[in-house]
Amino acid sequence: MEIPDQFLVGATGPSVARVLIAKTSLDGHWRGINVVSRALREGGFEVILAGMITAETIARVAADEDVDLIGLNVGGRVEVVERILDTLQAQHVTAPVFAGGTIPHYAAERLEKRGVRCFPPGSSLEDIVTAARELTGHA
């Protein structure tokens, strides 16, 4: 799947980590995803801002674009994130995943057991960018 240039933001080049950012709910809240995308871009990442797409599309874009990291806006829908994780695994996509937004405590524990780094509301942008560097090996 070809990603239009207007959705590719940040630095580019072979040594730059690529991050796919997607929403998992129709909650209408875009501020968090936009702020995190900008922080990652300013932190030196190439960001593919995909918006609201299906689990299958997330897996396809992640594979086609050879992303180094996948970021998901949870919106309180942990079962959707788990479906995305299952789809990524089935499609052999091994990029690490981080999730932000409204994540109930019990859900964060479930996701973290599956290797997802969780960032609830109020997490600092510095912590998110630092974690992205650690997860991609671009520290």
What is each residue range found by the language model?
Residues 1-48, 138-139:
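ATP-dependent carboxylate/acyl-activation modules
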